[in-house]
């Protein structure tokens, strides 16, 4: 079953665009291609490169942290970064996009970043929330009342699950350490342009 199967039938341009907005691999590939694109064309300035690098590193660390906690569709992750935000992997992605936009010093990188975020993340969040609600029901509802989708909540009202962070899971289930190396490589390309 596809992500758009339960939606009302679309017409016109929406019929063409909606499958792309809800297609997970499209979102991932656009983000993966964004990094080398802005790195290749980047015209970094030292202070923006430093600030952008710090933001991108924070984003990558959030993704690394989150991926070591999530047990997709098996256990509702409510600890680690999930104690603060429902979609920490998306928060990490957004920070990585922002960091590379800043580090590249390209005006159009910001415009492309905003487009990617607004085009892909609202439907992805809506879909994920509906799916988790269907799988975990009341447990998800109780947890999501206190935890925002993207803005950290420091209410101290995390869910009931508790799991230790796992590097093995982060590496083999999500490939996060490989993604970190990928990001470091392209950030280095920007550094060489100073």
Could you say what each language-model-derived stretch is?
Residues 1-79, 94-194:
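Membrane-anchoring alpha-helices and their flanking helix-loop junctions
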Residues 80-83, 87-93:
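Glycine-rich acyl-CoA binding loop
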């Amino acid at each position: 079953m596809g992500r758009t199967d339960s939606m009302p039938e679309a017409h016109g341009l929406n019929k063409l665009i909606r499958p792309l907005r809800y297609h997970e691999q499209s979102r991932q590939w656009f983000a993966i291609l964004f990094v080398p694109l802005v790195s290749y064309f980047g015209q970094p300035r030292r202070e923006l490169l430093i600030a952008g690098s710090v933001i991108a590193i924070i984003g990558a660390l959030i993704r690394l942290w989150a991926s070591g906690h999530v047990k997709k569709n098996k256990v509702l992750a409510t600890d680690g970064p999930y104690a603060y935000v429902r979609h920490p992997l998306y928060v990490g992605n957004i920070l990585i996009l922002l960091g590379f936009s800043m580090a590249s010093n390209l005006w159009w990188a910001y415009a492309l970043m905003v487009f990617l975020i607004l085009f892909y993340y609202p439907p992805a969040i809506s879909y994920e929330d509906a799916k988790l609600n269907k799988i975990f029901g009341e447990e998800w509802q109780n947890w999501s009342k206190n935890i925002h989708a993207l803005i950290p909540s420091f209410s101290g009202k995390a869910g009931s699950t508790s799991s230790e962070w796992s590097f093995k899971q982060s590496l083999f289930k999500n490939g996060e350490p490989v993604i970190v190396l990928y990001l470091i490589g392209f950030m280095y390309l920007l550094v060489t342009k100073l």
